[in-house]
Amino acid sequence: RKEVEQDPGPFNVPEGATVAFNCTYSNSASQSFFWYRQDCRKEPKLLMSVYSSGNEDGRFTAQLNRASQYISLLIRDSKLSDSATYLCVVNIRGGSQGNLIFGKGTKLSVKP
């Protein structure tokens, strides 16, 4: 089993739809979790940090289930500009640097 697993997609959704991505991780000692967004041929940018059970920011909600070792990202009222690759990132050691493991990413395409 890989350290971090994601469904690669692509998810094709109409504008305004709600879409959810799931990600599982194999190291139960992991302390912190992140969702990054990557636009075509650009550096990934931090979208959301998830430390306890979840986090919410506008149309984006991240949830963490430590017992099942998965995190999810929910995007409500999707917009054309949400089209990107979403990377699930797990810090498998403590500390600020730790050891970040990136998932392969889930591709989202929002259509008008």
Model-derived regions: residue spans:
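Extracellular domains of the immunoglobulin superfamily
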Residues: 1-112
